[in-house]
UniProtKB/Swiss-Prot annotation:
Source domain of life: Eukaryota
Subunit structure: Interacts with ATG1 to form the ATG1-ATG13 kinase complex.
Low complexity composition-biased segments: 624-634
Species assigned in the record: Kluyveromyces lactis (strain ATCC 8585 / CBS 2359 / DSM 70799 / NBRC 1267 / NRRL Y-1140 / WM37)
Compositionally skewed regions (Basic and acidic residues) per UniProt: 395-410
Role, per record: Activates the ATG1 kinase in a nutritional condition dependent manner through the TOR pathway, leading to autophagy. Also involved in cytoplasm to vacuole transport (Cvt) and more specifically in Cvt vesicle formation. Seems to play a role in the switching machinery regulating the conversion between the Cvt pathway and autophagy. Finally, ATG13 is also required for glycogen storage during stationary phase.
GO cellular component, one term: Atg1/ULK1 kinase complex
The name this protein goes by in its record: Autophagy-related protein 13
This protein's UniProt keywords: Autophagy, Cytoplasm, Protein transport, Transport
Length: 684
């Protein structure tokens, strides 16, 4: 055997020894003797390790390689020692999401395997090259391999258990240990949790691409080839190693069977904090009254203190609180029904005041926030509780101030609640443009519609200015009748009131007189334009009609009689003559003769009796000056039968004196314009 081969065999033996020492000392903290001199092999491969006689004795089968015999694989296990646990201990494991998983109870399992290292010389892959037989080249490769190995040991999850600090006063219940095993023999997992057993249920029966269980991971170091085989190092380890131990006896003492003092101090405090958090969820300005509890003597006193606590206020409340009152059982039980319902802060203060005066008990260490004096102005958010705040008058009592001194609340609201309150306080402008602004097209259409109505309004104003009276009657209507407003609809009438019958009868005569005077002025203006020589004397025309037209006189008399007895007025015959006069004046300017035919009874057919007084379309307004308004007007003109005018007809034959007298009477009758106001409908 050559010298180079001897050096290569020595490097292979040191490879196994250095690997075992490095893995053991990286996982287990030993108390080495500092006075012990370092041997030559401690600095081998530029990695410093301490000598371990026990480990060196166990590793003898792997450091006696002679180049001929077959070396078994070296298995180094890193495990969690559970032998120090008692039956009352329970081992749990946290997964990646922080969920606890129970592993075992104390005494059931002795070990939990965390890592398994495999160090071997694989003779199936032999390299006969010159570089593989060079000891210096092999040494350089082994230096790089151990540097990577040391780095890998510091990065594996099991290193977190080793570096985790623990209480030095109490011995650790679980420790990390290592063990050397012969890889050629089967490895048994009886009495321990093997590496192949998943603890977390989600990993069970799941394999990854490399045919490895999902709760495990594997790392391989690049092998180094020699003339005797390849040096390999492989590791398989658990991904989740966050193990911890719980003592069941401590849990029962702490949570299941607490002492009297602990129950009276811790449990009510937790309830008070929960009530405070619930009450603040109502609104940012919710009033909360907290009371610090003192230890009570006797179990009965403890039960009374728990039963006297108020439940959180429900819908419709403005605050909630937690009250505890020390004293006799009678005072405690009497406070419960008075404060058990949902009441406002004012009723709470009043109930406490009454209770203090009756039973003489006081509230200990009560925290009264300043919002109690102004609950109505405290909240600036609109809610359904505003009505309750407005109707509740809250006043602070001097006796209550003396017994309960205000203090700052020791319970701070959670951060998420504070952020929610800040979000509510941020004022943001509401975007109301899509709902309030109308389209431009609608605005333009409205403007065009109003412009088109202007011409109609002007024409209507001219017509109304001629039809309405210029001079109002001297006597104004001053009756303040409480009867229903007269209806101006021609289809539906209203029942006239008896209280205003007298005033209506007087107003009918005044209405006819005012209409006559207004028609005189219109008649004068129209005849002046046509050049007619017709006499427009109002009284003369009326007198002519009274002497020549007997029918008209009878109508006048019947009309006046109906004014006094039936409250149904008829139109004056003079209005008929006014219409004929107006029509005659318009026909005078034409060159052709127009034969106007009409019913002989057309004038008589128009009677006010068909229109009750309360349905007259003319509204009487007590105005000092004429008023023009844009209203819809409907008018009917009735024409009487008349013969051609001899003064304006060419080629007319002379008539007898009687005929000429009759025609002159007809001409006088035609001088007046009959403008029947009863058929005009003025609708506002």
């Amino acid at each position: 055997m050559s010298e180079g081969e001897v050096q290569v065999i020595e490097l292979i033996n040191n490879f196994f020894l250095k690997s075992a020492l490095l893995l053991e000392q990286s996982k287990v903290a030993h108390n080495f003797d500092t006075e012990e001199a370092l041997r030559d092999g401690n600095h081998l491969f530029n990695i410093e390790t301490r000598g371990d006689p026990l480990l060196e004795a166990q590793i003898q089968p792997w450091i006696t390689f002679d180049g001929v015999k077959t070396m078994p694989p070296l298995v180094i296990e890193t495990y969690l020692d559970l032998r120090a646990l008692q039956p009352n201990h329970m081992v749990y494991l946290h997964d990646a999401d922080g969920n606890p998983w129970m592993v075992c109870k104390g005494g059931k399992k002795t070990e939990i395997v965390l890592e398994r290292w495999l160090v071997e010389l694989d003779k199936q892959t032999i390299d006969d090259s010159i570089d593989s037989n060079d000891p210096e080249n092999l040494h350089k490769q082994l230096v790089l391999l151990f540097r990577y190995l040391y780095t890998l040991t510091q990065l594996l999850p099991a290193n977190d258990i080793i570096t985790k600090p623990h209480n030095s006063q109490q011995p650790a219940l679980i420790n990390v240990q290592t063990r050397l095993l012969d890889g050629s023999k089967p490895i048994l997992s009886k009495g321990r949790v093997g590496l192949s057993k998943p603890i977390i249920a989600s990993y069970s029966n799941t394999m990854n691409e490399t045919n490895i269980a999902s709760h495990l991971e594997q790392r391989k170091i690049t092998p180094i080839k020699t003339t005797f085989g390849s040096l390999r190092i492989t590791v398989s380890y658990r991904k989740d190693v966050d193990f911890y131990v719980i003592d069941s006896d401590d849990l029962q003492k702490r949570y299941m069977t607490p002492s009297l003092s602990n129950e009276t101090t811790t449990v009510p405090d937790r309830r008070a904090s929960s009530n405070c958090s619930r009450s603040m969820s109502v609104s940012p300005k919710t009033n909360t009254i907290n009371a610090t509890l003192f230890p009570l003597e006797g179990s009965s006193a403890r039960r009374q203190s728990i039963s006297s606590k108020l439940q959180p206020f429900k819908v419709g409340s403005v605050g909630s609180g937690s009250f505890v009152q020390s004293g006799s059982a009678q005072s405690t039980t009497s406070l419960v029904p008075s404060l058990s319902r949902n009441v406002s802060s004012s009723s709470v203060v009043a109930a406490l005041k009454v209770q203090r005066g009756s039973a003489g008990s006081t509230i200990v260490n009560g925290d009264v926030p300043p919002e109690l004096s102004s609950v109505g102005s405290g909240s600036k958010y609109s809610s359904s509780f505003g009505r309750i705040r407005r109707h509740s008058s809250i006043r602070r009592s001097e006796s209550f101030d003396r017994t309960a001194k205000p203090r700052k609340s020791t319970e701070n609201p959670p951060e998420d609640l504070l952020e929610f309150v800040k979000l509510l306080e941020d004022k943001k402008e509401l975007n109301m443009k899509p709902n309030t602004i109308l389209p431009q097209q609608d605005i333009s259409n409205s403007l065009m519609r109003f412009q088109s109505m202007k011409s109609n309004n002007d024409a209507l104003s001219d017509n109304l200015s001629m039809s309405m009276s210029i001079d109002q009657p001297n006597v104004r209507f001053g009756s303040n009748s409480h009867s229903p407003i007269p209806s101006f609809s021609p289809n539906y009438g209203s029942i006239p009131s008896r209280l205003s019958q007298g005033s209506r009868n007087n107003s009918n005569a005044e209405l006819i007189t005012s209409r006559k005077s207004s028609l005189d002025r219109h008649k004068h203006n129209l005849l002046s334009r046509t050049g007619s020589n017709v006499d427009i004397n109002r009284r003369g025309s009326v007198g002519t009609m009274e002497t020549t037209n007997e029918d008209s006189k009878e109508d006048e008399q019947s009309h006046m009689k109906g004014m006094h007895f039936s409250n149904e007025a008829t139109i004056n015959k003079d209005d008929d003559e006014d219409e004929m006069l107006m029509k005659r004046s318009f026909n005078a300017g034409t060159s052709t003769t127009e034969q106007v035919m009409g019913s002989p009874r057309s004038i008589r057919s128009i009677s006010v009796s068909s229109y009750p007084r309360n349905q007259l379309p003319l509204k009487h307004l007590n105005l000092s000056h004429p008023t023009t308004s844009a209203t819809t007007t409907h008018a009917k003109f009735h024409k009487s039968e008349m013969s051609p005018d001899p003064l304006h007809t060419e080629g007319a034959q002379p008539h007898t004196s009687s005929q000429h007298h009759n025609s002159s009477q007809k001409n006088d009758e035609d001088d007046d314009l009959l403008f029947v106001m009863s058929d005009m409908n003025l609708t506002n």
